Amino acid sequence: MSALQEIPSPISNMQTSNFAHVIFQNVAKSYLPNAPLECHYTLTQYIHPHPKDWVGIFKVGWSTPRDYFTFLWSLMPEKYVAESTCNCVLTFQGYYLPNDDGEFYQFCYVTHKGEIRGASTPFQFRASSPVDELLTMEDEGHSDMLVVTTKTGLLELKIEKTMKEKEELVKITTVLEKEVLQLREHVEGLESEFLREQKRSEQLSSEREELFNASEILRNESDEAKRKCKEMSAKIIQLEEDIMLVTQKAIAKETELDSLKDKLKKVVLEKDQLECQLKYEKDEKDLYKVHLKNTEIENTKLLTEVQTLKNLDTNKENLISHYKEELGKLQICLADKEKMNKELLQNSSNKEDIAFLKQQLRKLEDQHQASRQEVSLMSRELSEAVNKRDKTMADLHSARLDTDSVRMQLADALAQLSMRDEQQQKSNPFAKKDQGADNNRVEQELRKEVEDLKLRLQMAADHYKDKFKECQKLQKQVVKLTEQLKATENQQKERELFCATEAAAVTVMKQCTPPVSPFTSDSLPEFDIREQVREMSLEMAEKTEKYRKCKQMLAEEKARCSAYADDVAKMELKWKEQLKVNDSIKRQLIALDDQYKVQSAEKDREICDLSYSIETLRNEKAKMERFINDLEKKLEKQAGWAASNTQGLQFFNPYCDEHRLAPAIPAQQPLLQFGNPYASQETRDGADGAFNPDEVQGPPVRATSWGLEDKVVCSQPARNLSRPDGLEDPDENNAGLITKDEDDDDDDDNVNFEQTPDPTRIAMHDQSGFCFEAGYTMNKKCPLCPVSFPPNYDQGQFEAHVESHWKVCPMCNEQFPPDCDQQIFERHVQTHFDGSVLNFD
C-alpha cells in the first residue's frame, strides 16, 4: 500500500479541462450485458484525432489508462477538418462487455500518448427484467392514483395524442384558410363600398386644405432646391475655371520641365566635353612630365656648367690679378723705357705706339670686367630659372591634385546625373519619343564641338612638340657653347702663361743687358705684345659674341617657360571656373527638380481635390434635380387628385389589434426533447435511463403568425450616411405601386392602405432610408427594374436583388447609382491607389 501511495496518479497531474475535449452523448444509466453497445461521442476543436487513439470501458475508480476492461480503436473520421467538431460512433460487441456485476463503468477516450481527454457519466450493465419495462404515471382524471404501464403502451398513447393534435391542426388550417377567403371577399366588398361612397365632403375639404399646405411647403422646398441648384451651378462654373487655370499652370510647368530637360542635356554634353578635356589634359600632363624630366636633366647640366663657369671665373680672376701684377711690372718697365727713350731721344712714333698699347690694355681690362659682370648675370639668371622650374613643378603637382579632385567630382556628378536620368525616365516614360529628335540634334552639335576640340588639342600638341624639339636643340647649342667656352678659356690660359713667361724673360733680359739702341732690343717685345693684345682682343670679341648668344637663348627659354606657365595657369583658372559653373548648374538643377516635384505633387493633389469636388457637386446637382422632379411629380399628382375629388383605395390593416383573431392554440416555448445528458441524476426516473413522461414531449405546437406578430419590420442592412442617388421615396414607391395596380390590375386581389398625405411624412423624406412598410402584403416590385416578387418572397433575397443594381466600391463599400458613369466609378476606385485622401463627409 505504501508503494502504491508513493506512485503519483496521472489523473492528479492532468488538467481538469482535458476531460472536456471529448464529449460522450446519450449515455444511459444501464445497458444489457450481452447486447451490442453503441458509444456516441463528439470530438471538439481542442483535440487532434490520431489512428492510435482508442475508447475504453473503465471501472469507476480507475487510476491509470491500463485499468481498462475492454477497448476499441477510434477510427479517423471521414472528411475531417482541423479545428472543428466531429461526431463519431463505436459499437462494442456483446461478448466483450462485462456481466451483470453491480459495478459502475464509464467510457474514456485515450490518446496515442496515453492521455485521457474525455470521460462519460457512470453506467451499469444489468440484465433485463419485466419490472424495468414498467412505468408509473398519474391518472389523467386528476385523481391521486398512479397507473402502472409499459413503455410501449406509453409510446403508443403519445403517438395517438400526436396524431389527434395533427388532425386538430389540419382542421384549424382549413378553418383559417376559409377565414382568409372570407376576409378577402370582405375586403373586396369594402373596396366596392369605398368606390361608391363619395359623400364625405367635409373630410375631402380638410384633406384639400392639408394638400394645399403641403403643396405650398413643397413649392418652398422646390424654390430652395432651385436656388441651391443655381449656387451649385455657379460653384461648378467657378471650379471649371479653376481647373482651366490649374491646367494652364500644369502646361507652364511642363514647358519649364522641358526647358530643364534641355538644360540637363546641355549639362550632360558639357560634362562629356569636360571628360574629353580631362583626357587631353592627362595627355598634356604626361607630356609636361616628360618635359619636366628633360628640364630637370638640363637644369642639372646647367648647374654643373654654372659651377664650371664659376671655377673659370675664379681662374680668370687669378689670371687677372696675375696680369695686373705683370702689368705693373710692365708699367715699371715702360717707365724705364720712357726714361731710356727720353735719354736716347727716340722718335715720336715710338711714343705713339706706346700710347696705343696703353689704350689697348685699358680696353682689355674693360672687356674683362664686362665679361665678369656678364658671368655674374648669367649665374643670377640660372638661379632664377631654377626657382621658376621649382615653382612650375609645385604648380604641376597642385594641378595634378586638382585634376584628381575634379575627376572624382565629375564621377560623382556623372553618377548623380545618371541616377536622375533613370528616375526621370521612369517617371516620364512617355516623354522619350518627344525628346528623340531634340536628343539627336543636340548629339550632332556636341559631336561637332568635340571634333573641333579634338582638332584644337591636336594642334596644341603639335605646337608643344615643336617647342619641345626647339628647346632640345637650344639645349644642345648651349652645351656646345659651354664646351667652346671651356676650350677658349683653356687656350687663353695657355697663352697668358706663355705671355707671362715671355714677359718675365724679357724683363730678365732687360735687367741683365745694358741699354742698347731702341730699334734692336725693345722692338721685339713690343711687337709680341701687340700680337698678344690683338689675339686677346679677338678672343674677347668671340667670347662676348658667345655670351650674347647664350644670353639670347636663355632669354628665349625663359620666355617660353613663362608662356607655358601662363598657359597652365590660364587652363587651371578656366578649369576652376568651369567646375564652379558646373556646381552652380547642378545645384540649380537639383533645386529646380525639387521645386518641380513639390509643385507637381501639389498640383496633382489640387487637381484630384477639384475633380473629386466636381464629382460630388455633380452628384449633388443630380440629386437635387431628381428631388425637384420628384417634388414636381408629387405636386402634379396631388393637384390632379384634389381637382378630381378622387381618393385612393382604403382598406383596413388585417394585422392590427382590432381585426386580429385569438390564437387557436396557446403559444408555448419548446422544451428539450431528449433532455440534458449531463443533468443531475435526481431528475432521472428510474435507474435504467428510461424517458420521463414529463420530459417526453411531442413536436412543439407553432402558434399562428396572427397571434405572434404585431408588426412586420423588414431588416435592412446598414447603408452609407448619404442617401443613394436615384432611389425613390418608399412612400412614393408604395403609392406608385398602388396606383399602378389600380390602373393595370383591377381584378387582382391586392390591398391598398388608406392614403392620407401627412406633412411630417414629407419632412421625414430624407430620413426614411430604403425600407418597406410593415403592412404591405401585395406583390413586391423592384424599384429599379420591372421584376416583381410574390408577397411571401424572402426579404433578404429581395434586398440582395435590389442592391445588385448598385455599383459598390470594393475598397470603401461606397454605393453608386446604376446610371452612374463607369469612368467616374473607375476614377473613384483609382483614387484609393493614388495615395490621395478621400473625405466621405
Swiss-Prot record:
Zn(2+) 2 binds at C809, C812, H828, H832. PROSITE patterns: ZF_UBZ1. One of its GO terms (biological process) is apoptotic process. Residues 173-560, 612-640 form a coiled coil. Gene3D superfamilies: 2.60.40.2840, 6.20.250.40. Residues 419-441, 678-759 are annotated as: Disordered. A zinc finger (UBZ1-type) spans 779-805, 806-832. One of its GO terms (molecular function) is zinc ion binding. Pfam families: CALCOCO1 (PF07888), SKICH (PF17751), Zn-C2H2_12 (PF18112). The keyword Repeat applies. Residues 741-751 have a biased composition (Acidic residues). The keyword rRNA-binding does not apply. CDD domains: Zn-C2H2_TAX1BP1_rpt1, Zn-C2H2_TAX1BP1_rpt2. May have an anti-apoptotic activity. This is Tax1-binding protein 1 homolog. The lineage of its organism: Eukaryota, Metazoa, Chordata, Craniata, Vertebrata.
